[in-house]
C-alpha cells in the first residue's frame, strides 16, 4: 500500500495520495487499538489510549474526504498492497502453517487467475468512476477512487455485518475481522463486482461474536452504510481462515427488514424447490427495461451465499437551528473540553493541532458543525457500547452533542486519573531506582573497605536456599514477606535476630525433597532377617506395607505402634524398617515429657523460641518422608500447666489431620502425611485411648530360650567380641554355656540382660588374655619430670612446654595359641554365683499352692498363689478370707469371687466337706514388693482354695491362666505367648488356658509349644478334672471328717455342761 501512495504522489495526484494515506494510517492505528483490546484487563488502559489515538488520527483524513478531496476509497485486494497485518482487528493474519510446498504452489496457481480478474475488474471500475484518467508516473495503471457523488445513495439490498464491540460513526475508519467462510466469499464477490459496500450494525448481546444474524432483533436497527477500503486474507492462531478489512462509514442508515438469512437459505436448500427463496428473490428484484430486456439487481448474488441481507433507509438528522443558545453553549463547552483534554493528553493535543491545520480548507468545518463535532467526540471516546449506540441513533443534533459531551468529560477524568497514576508511579520508580543505586554504591564502598554486610549476606543466603526448594504457595508468600521485612530491619534491632532465625528455619526444611522409596520385597526381607531373628509379625507387616506401596506407586505415611517387653528389639527394628524402605531414620523419646512445646514448638515472640521435635526431625533428615520413631509413648507425662503432650500427638498421629500439622513456631501448616511414624511402648494400659485408636498396634512377645540362643550366636556374641577387641581371638562361648547363662542368670523376656552378661564375659576374657601374655605397656622412654624455677622468679616466655607426643598404640594381634573355652562350669569365673538356682520356687508344692501365669510389661512370668489356714479348725473358728501380696483392685475382686465360687463348687461336688464353714483362710502371692493386678488369676485362686479345701497337693509341673465368673465360666485372657514362654522357662509340662484362646495357641511357633501339653478349659469343671480327677466323692467328703467330728463332740460337751 505504501508503494501505491508513493506512486500516486509522483504523478501529481495529491488527492489520491491523501486518500490512500488516510486509509493506510487509519487501518494501522485502528488495528493496533484492536490488538491492544485483546490483551485483557491488564491492558485496558493501553487499549483505551490506542483506540482514542486511532479514531482521532483517522479523523484528520476523514475531513479531507468530506471536503471533496476524497470520498470513498478503492478496495485493495491482497495482491495490490504490501504485506501489512495492521488491518486485522482481532488477530493478526499470518501465513498458513503445516502445508507442504506442492500444496501451496497448487493453490497459488488456482488463485492467481481469479485475483488477476478481480484486479482488472477493480481497475476498470475505478477508471470508470474517475472519468478514465490514470496516474502515469509509476502508478501501475491504477485510477483514482470514485468521488463523493459516485457513492450510491441506495441499494435495493446489501449485506448486513453485525459488530460486537462498539458501533461505527460516519467518517471514521474501523478494522474488522470476519471468520465465516460464507461472509468471506460474499465480500470477495462484492469486491469482484465493484460493490464494496455493506451495512454495519451493533449486536445487542455483547457476549455474541458472529458474522451473520438470523433475526432483526439481534442487532440495533440504526447503523452505518460503510465502504470496504482494503482487505487482507490470512489465518488466526487456531488455524481458521480469516479476512481482515478496513471499513469507512459514510452515513447513518436504518435496517428496515431482512431479505435473507443463513437460516432461510439453509431451509430453502433443504426443500430444493423451484419456487424456493433464492428464485423468489431473483424474480422480486428483476425489472424489464423499456426495450424489453431484463436487468438483474447487482447484489442479488448475495441471496445464494448464505449471508444476512437486508434493506436499508437513510437515518437523517433533524433540522439544526444554528442560532440556538443551548447548541452554541454545548459547542463551546465541547471545544473547551477538547482544549483541556489536549493540555493533559499530548496525543490528543497533536491530533487537534493537525485538525486545526486543515480545518480552514474543509467545508463544513468540524469545529463549526455540531453534528461532525458530536461524531468526532463519540468516535474518540471509550465508553459503553449501548451508550455509544444511543449517540449514533440520536437524530437531534443538540441532544447528540450533549450526550457526546458526557463522553468527553469522562475522557478528561480518565486522562487526569492516568496522569495522577503516572506521576505517582514515576515517583515510586525514581525513589526505588535511587535507593537501588545508593545501595549498590554503599555495597561497593564496603567491599573496597573490606567490610562485609551481615544482613546482605544473610539475605543472599536465604535467597540461594529458596531457589533450590519447592515452597508451597502459602510458604512462598510467608517467605517473601519475612524476607522483605528482614531487608528493612537494622542488624541491631531485636526483631532482626527473630526474623533471621525464622527464615533460617523455613529455608532449612526439605520442601519438595524426598528420598526414593525401595519397593523390592526380597531386598527388604533380607535386611529385616539380617538385623533381627524372629519377629515374624513385624516383618510381615512391613512387607505388606511395601507391597501396597508398590501397587499404588507410592508409600503413604502410616502410624505403627510396637508393644512389647523391654529388650525385645523395638527400637532396633525401627532402624531396620528405615533401611528396608530406604528412608532416613530419626528417633526421639517422649518418656516423661510434660511440656507440649516439645511437640509443637514455642511461640516465636519468646526469647530462645524453637520449633518442636517434629520440625527438628525434618531439618535433620532433610527429606519430607523420613521414618520417625517416637520412643516410650506409654510413659508420656501427665497433664500439667504446660499442656498435655498426649493431646498434641493426636493431631500428629491422625492420618486425616497430619497433612496440615501446625507447629506453633512456624505458624503455618506443614505436611507430615508422608512421614512413617513408628511408636514403641511396653504396655498399652497407660496410653490414652484416643491416641491408641490412631495407631496400628503390633505386639512383640518375649523370646524363648531357643530364640535367645540364636540371637546370641548371630548378633550378640560377634558384637561383643568386636567391641572388646577380641574379633580375631579364639574365644569360644558354647551353646550349652548360653543355655546355662539363660537358665541361671538371664530369665527376662528380652535379650538386653543377656547382652550385658555376654559383654561382661568377653571383658573378663580380654583381661585374662592380656595378663596371660604378660604385656608391658609402659612407655620405654618417658620424659623425666623436672621442676626448674626461673632465676628471676618469672616464667621464661621462650620456654616451650614439655609434651608427650607418643604414637597411638596399634591393635594387639593375639596369637592362635591363645584359646579360651567358656563352658557352663566356668561361667562362675566370669559372672559369679548363679542368680537363679532353681526353675521353680516349689519343686514339690504343698496343698493350697498353685503355679499361675502372669503378663507384665517385662513379659510373661510365673506367679504362685498360696492359701493356708490361719488357725486350726475348731468350734470357735469363724470363716474368713485374708489376702496379701500387693494385690490390685482387680485381683482383690478375683480373690473374693474365687472364694465364693469355691464354696459353691464344694457344696455341689462334695456336700459333706464342711471346710469353708470354719476355715479362716489366708491367700498370698509371693514377692510382695511387686505390685500385682490383672484379670487372669481367677482359676488359679479357685484351684488354690479347692486344693486347700481337699488337702491335696497339685502337680508342680502344671501352670494355668484364665479368669473365672461366679458360675464357673472360664473367660479369655491376653498375653498367651508370653505366658507360654514363662511356663516353659519354669519347667512346666502342662498349661491350662481358656478355650477362647485356642486360636492364639495355634498361632504360636512350634518351638514355643514344644514340650507343653495344652488344656483348653471352657468351664471350671475342665480344670477340676485335670487337677483333681483322681479324687473320689468319698475322699472329698471325708477330708476334714475327723476335725468336724471333734468339733461336734466339743459342742455336745459344752452344751451338756451348761
UniProtKB/Swiss-Prot annotation:
Localization per Swiss-Prot or TrEMBL: Mitochondrion matrix
The Lon proteolytic domain extends over: 844-1030
A GO cellular component entry from the record: mitochondrial matrix
The record's section on SUPFAM superfamilies has: P-loop containing nucleoside triphosphate hydrolases, PUA domain-like, Ribosomal protein S5 domain 2-like
Q: Which GO terms describe its biological process?
A: cellular response to oxidative stress; chaperone-mediated protein complex assembly; mitochondrial protein quality control; mitochondrion organization; oxidation-dependent protein catabolic process; protein quality control for misfolded or incompletely synthesized proteins; regulation of mitochondrial DNA metabolic process
Name a GO molecular-function annotation.
sequence-specific DNA binding
Which residues participate directly in catalysis? 936, 979
Q: What are the entry keywords?
A: ATP-binding, DNA-binding, Hydrolase, Mitochondrion, Nucleotide-binding, Protease, Serine protease, Transit peptide
Q: Which residues bind ATP?
A: 564-571
- Which segments cross the bilayer? none
Q: Region entry Disordered: which residue ranges?
A: 72-151, 778-814
Task: Describe the location of the Lon N-terminal domain by residue ranges.
Answer: 158-412
Q: Where is the composition biased (Gly residues)?
A: 129-142
Query: Can you state which reaction this protein catalyses?
Result: Hydrolysis of proteins in presence of ATP
Q: Which InterPro entries match?
A: AAA+_ATPase, ATPase_AAA_core, Lon_bac/euk-typ, Lon_lid, Lon_proteolytic, Lon_Prtase, Lon_prtase_N, Lon_prtase_N_sf
Under Pfam families, the record lists: AAA, Lon_C, Lon_lid, LON_substr_bdg
This entry's Enzyme Commission designation comes to: 3.4.21.53
Q: Where is the composition biased (Basic and acidic residues)?
A: 78-97, 106-118
Where is the transit peptide, renumbered to this chain? Answer: 1-47
| Main localization (coarse) | mitochondrion
Quaternary assembly:
Homohexamer or homoheptamer. Organized in a ring with a central cavity.
Its job: ATP-dependent serine protease that mediates the selective degradation of misfolded, unassembled or oxidatively damaged polypeptides as well as certain short-lived regulatory proteins in the mitochondrial matrix. May also have a chaperone function in the assembly of inner membrane protein complexes. Participates in the regulation of mitochondrial gene expression and in the maintenance of the integrity of the mitochondrial genome. Binds to mitochondrial DNA in a site-specific manner.
Please give the family membership noted in the entry: Belongs to the peptidase S16 family.
Protein's recorded name: Lon protease homolog, mitochondrial
Protein's organism: Eremothecium gossypii (strain ATCC 10895 / CBS 109.51 / FGSC 9923 / NRRL Y-1056)
Amino acid at each position: 500500500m505504501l508503494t501505491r501512495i508513493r506512486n500516486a504522489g509522483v504523478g501529481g495526484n495529491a488527492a489520491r495520495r491523501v486518500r490512500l494515506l488516510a486509509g493506510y494510517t487509519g487501518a494501522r492505528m485502528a488495528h493496533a487499538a484492536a490488538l491492544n483490546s485483546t490483551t485483557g484487563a491488564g491492558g485496558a488502559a493501553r487499549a483505551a489510549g490506542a483506540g482514542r489515538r486511532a479514531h482521532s488520527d483517522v479523523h484528520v483524513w476523514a475531513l479531507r474526504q468530506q471536503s471533496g478531496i476524497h470520498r470513498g476509497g478503492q478496495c485493495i485486494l491482497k495482491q495490490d498492497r504490501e504485506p501489512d497485518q495492521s488491518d486485522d482487528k482481532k488477530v493478526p493474519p499470518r501465513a498458513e502453517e503445516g502445508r507442504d510446498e506442492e500444496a501451496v504452489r497448487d493453490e497459488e496457481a488456482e488463485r492467481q487467475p481469479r485475483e488477476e480478474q478481480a484486479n482488472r475488474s477493480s481497475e476498470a471500475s475505478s477508471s470508470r468512476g474517475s472519468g478514465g484518467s490514470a496516474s502515469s508516473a509509476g502508478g501501475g495503471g491504477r485510477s483514482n477512487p470514485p468521488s463523493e457523488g459516485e457513492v450510491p445513495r441506495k441499494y435495493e439490498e446489501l449485506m448486513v455485518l453485525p459488530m460486537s464491540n462498539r458501533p461505527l460513526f460516519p467518517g471514521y475508519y474501523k478494522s474488522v475481522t470476519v471468520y465465516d467462510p460464507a461472509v468471506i466469499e460474499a465480500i470477495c464477490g462484492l469486491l469482484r463486482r465493484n460493490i464494496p459496500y455493506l451495512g454495519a450494525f451493533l449486536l445487542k448481546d455483547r457476549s455474541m461474536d458472529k458474522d451473520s444474524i438470523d433475526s432483526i432483533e439481534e442487532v440495533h436497527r440504526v447503523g452505518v452504510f460503510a465502504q470496504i477500503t482494503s482487505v487482507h486474507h490470512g489465518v488466526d492462531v487456531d488455524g481458521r481462515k480469516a479476512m481482515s478489512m478496513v471499513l469507512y462509514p459514510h452515513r447513518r442508515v436504518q435496517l428496515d427488514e431482512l431479505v435473507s438469512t443463513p437460516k432461510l437459505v439453509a431451509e430453502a436448500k433443504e426443500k430444493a424447490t423451484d419456487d424456493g427463496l433464492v428464485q423468489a428473490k431473483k424474480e422480486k428484484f428483476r425489472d424489464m427495461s423499456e426495450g424489453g430486456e431484463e436487468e438483474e439487481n447487482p447484489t442479488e448474488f448475495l441471496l445464494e451465499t448464505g449471508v444476512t441481507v437486508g434493506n436499508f433507509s437513510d437515518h437523517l438528522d433533524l433540522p439544526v437551528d444554528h442560532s440556538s443558545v443551548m447548541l452554541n453553549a454545548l459547542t463551546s463547552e465541547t471545544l473547551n473540553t477538547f482544549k483541556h483534554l489536549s493540555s493533559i493528553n499530548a496525543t490528543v493535543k497533536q491530533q487537534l493541532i493537525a485538525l486545526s491545520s486543515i480545518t480552514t480548507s474543509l467545508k463544513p468545518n468540524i469545529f463549526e458543525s455540531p453534528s461532525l463535532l458530536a461524531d468526532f467526540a463519540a468516535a474518540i471516546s471509550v465508553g459503553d457500547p449501548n451508550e455509544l449506540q444511543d449517540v449514533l441513533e440520536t437524530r437531534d443534533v443538540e441532544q447528540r452533542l450533549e450526550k457526546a459531551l458526557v463522553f468527553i468529560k469522562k475522557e478528561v477524568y480518565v486522562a487526569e486519573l492516568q496522569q495522577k497514576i503516572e506521576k505517582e508511579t514515576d515517583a515510586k520508580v525514581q525513589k526505588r531506582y535511587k535507593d537501588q543505586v545508593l545501595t549498590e554504591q554503599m555495597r561497593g564502598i564496603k567491599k573496597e573497605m573490606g567490610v562485609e554486610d551481615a544482613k546482605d549476606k544473610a539475605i543472599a543466603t536465604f535467597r540461594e536456599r529458596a531457589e533450590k526448594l519447592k515452597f508451597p504457595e502459602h510458604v512462598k508468600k510467608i517467605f517473601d514477606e519475612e524476607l522483605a521485612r528482614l531487608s528493612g530491619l537494622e542488624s541491631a534491632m531485636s526483631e532482626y535476630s527473630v526474623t533471621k532465625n525464622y527464615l533460617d528455619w523455613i529455608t532449612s526444611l526439605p520442601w519438595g525433597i524426598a528420598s526414593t522409596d525401595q519397593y523390592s520385597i526380597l531386598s527388604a526381607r533380607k535386611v529385616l532377617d539380617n538385623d533381627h531373628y524372629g519377629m515374624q509379625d513385624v516383618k510381615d507387616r512391613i512387607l505388606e506395607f511395601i507391597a501396597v506401596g508398590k501397587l499404588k506407586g507410592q508409600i503413604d505415611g502410616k502410624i505403627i505402634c510396637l508393644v512389647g517387653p523391654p529388650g525385645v528389639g523395638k527400637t532396633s527394628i525401627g532402624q531396620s524398617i528405615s533401611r528396608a524402605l530406604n528412608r532416613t531414620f530419626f528417633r526421639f523419646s517422649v518418656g516423661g515429657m510434660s511440656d507440649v512445646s516439645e511437640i509443637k514448638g514455642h511461640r516465636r515472640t519468646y526469647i530462645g523460641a524453637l520449633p518442636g521435635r517434629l520440625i527438628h526431625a525434618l531439618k535433620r533428615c532433610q527429606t519430607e518422608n523420613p521414618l520417625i520413631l517416637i520412643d516410650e509413648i506409654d510413659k508420656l507425662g501427665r497433664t500439667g500447666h504446660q499442656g498435655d503432650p498426649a493431646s498434641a500427638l493426636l493431631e500428629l498421629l491422625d492420618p486425616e489431620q497430619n497433612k496440615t500439622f501446625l507447629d506453633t513456631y512456624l505458624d503455618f501448616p506443614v505436611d507430615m502425611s508422608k512421614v512413617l511414624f513408628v511408636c514403641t511402648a511396653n504396655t498399652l494400659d497407660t496410653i490414652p485411648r484416643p491416641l491408641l485408636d490412631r495407631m496400628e498396634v503390633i505386639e512383640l512377645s518375649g523370646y524363648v530360650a531357643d530364640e535367645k540362643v540364636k540371637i546370641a550366636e548371630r548378633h550378640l556374641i560377634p558384637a561383643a567380641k568386636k567391641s572388646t577387641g577380641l574379633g580375631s581371638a579364639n574365644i569360644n562361648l558354647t551353646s550349652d554355656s548360653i543355655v546355662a547363662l539363660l537358665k541361671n542368670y538371664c530369665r527376662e523376656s528380652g535379650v538386653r540382660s543377656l547382652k550385658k552378661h555376654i559383654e561382661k564375659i568377653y571383658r573378663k576374657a580380654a583381661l585374662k588374655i592380656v595378663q596371660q601374655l604378660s604385656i608391658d605397656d609402659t612407655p620405654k622412654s618417658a620424659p623425666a619430670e623436672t621442676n626448674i624455677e626461673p632465676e628471676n622468679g618469672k616464667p621464661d616466655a621462650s620456654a616451650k612446654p614439655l609434651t608427650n607426643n607418643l604414637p597411638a598404640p596399634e591393635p594387639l594381634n593375639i596369637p592362635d595359641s591363645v584359646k579360651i573355652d567358656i563352658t557352663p562350669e566356668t561361667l562362675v569365673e566370669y559372672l559369679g554365683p548363679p542368680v537363679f538356682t532353681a526353675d521353680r520356687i516349689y519343686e514339690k508344692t504343698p496343698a493350697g499352692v498353685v503355679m499361675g501365669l502372669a503378663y507384665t510389661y517385662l513379659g510373661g512370668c510365673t506367679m504362685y498363689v498360696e492359701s493356708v489356714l490361719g488357725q486350726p479348725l475348731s468350734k470357735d473358728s469363724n470363716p474368713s478370707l485374708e489376702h496379701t501380696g500387693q494385690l490390685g483392685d482387680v485381683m482383690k475382686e478375683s480373690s473374693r469371687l474365687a472364694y465364693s465360687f469355691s464354696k459353691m463348687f464344694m457344696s455341689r461336688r462334695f456336700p459333706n466337706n464342711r471346710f469353708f464353714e470354719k476355715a479362716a483362710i489366708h491367700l498370698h502371692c509371693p514377692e510382695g514388693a511387686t505390685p500385682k493386678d490383672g484379670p487372669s488369676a481367677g482359676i488359679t485362686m479357685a484351684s488354690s482354695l479347692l486344693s486347700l479345701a481337699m488337702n491335696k497337693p497339685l502337680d508342680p509341673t502344671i501352670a494355668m491362666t484364665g479368669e473365672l465368673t461366679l458360675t464357673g465360666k472360664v473367660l479369655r485372657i491376653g498375653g498367651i505367648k508370653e505366658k507360654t514362654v514363662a511356663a516353659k522357662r519354669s519347667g512346666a509340662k502342662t498349661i491350662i488356658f481358656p478355650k477362647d484362646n485356642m486360636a492364639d495357641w495355634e498361632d504360636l511357633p512350634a518351638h514355643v509349644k514344644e514340650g507343653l501339653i495344652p488344656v483348653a478349659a471352657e468351664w471350671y469343671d475342665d480344670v477340676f478334672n485335670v487337677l483333681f480327677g483322681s479324687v473320689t466323692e468319698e475322699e472329698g467328703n471325708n477330708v476334714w471328717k475327723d476335725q468336724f467330728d471333734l468339733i461336734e463332740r466339743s459342742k455336745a460337751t459344752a452344751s451338756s455342761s451348761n
